[in-house]
């Protein structure tokens, strides 16, 4: 007969690795072509002039300039553009 009660096993202890999403360059900061501006899931921020969008919705600078954030349109969408300095 067992003199020790069987130990339970936990079903917790898993968590996904953080994806380091968010704004990488803020309004007024200088950007060079190819710089990542925003890493995001979906289009929380939309690409304005001088900004490209990757297949994972990452926004990046297409040319050198200064970052500008603005809201436009009837749905108040957030746009990011690169304005030449």
From Swiss-Prot:
Recorded GO MF terms: structural constituent of ribosome
Keyword Aminoacyl-tRNA synthetase tagged: no
Assigned GO CC terms: cytosolic large ribosomal subunit
NCBIfam families for this protein: L27 (TIGR00062)
Annotated keywords: Ribonucleoprotein, Ribosomal protein
GO biological process: translation
InterPro entries: Ribosomal_bL27 (IPR001684), Ribosomal_bL27_CS (IPR018261)
PANTHER family named in the record: LARGE RIBOSOMAL SUBUNIT PROTEIN BL27M, RIBOSOMAL PROTEIN L27
Pfam family, one: Ribosomal_L27
Source organism: Chromohalobacter salexigens (strain ATCC BAA-138 / DSM 3043 / CIP 106854 / NCIMB 13768 / 1H11)
Protein name listed in UniProt: Large ribosomal subunit protein bL27
Disordered: region residues: 1-21
Family per similarity comment: Belongs to the bacterial ribosomal protein bL27 family.
């Amino acid at each position: 007969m067992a003199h020790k009660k069987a130990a339970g096993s936990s079903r917790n202890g898993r968590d996904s690795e953080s994806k380091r999403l968010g704004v990488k360059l803020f309004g007024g900061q200088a950007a060079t072509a190819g710089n990542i501006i925003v890493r995001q899931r979906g289009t929380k921020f939309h690409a304005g002039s001088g900004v490209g969008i990757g297949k994972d919705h990452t926004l990046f600078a297409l040319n050198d300039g200064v970052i500008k954030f603005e809201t436009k349109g009837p749905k108040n969408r957030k746009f990011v553009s690169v304005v030449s300095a």
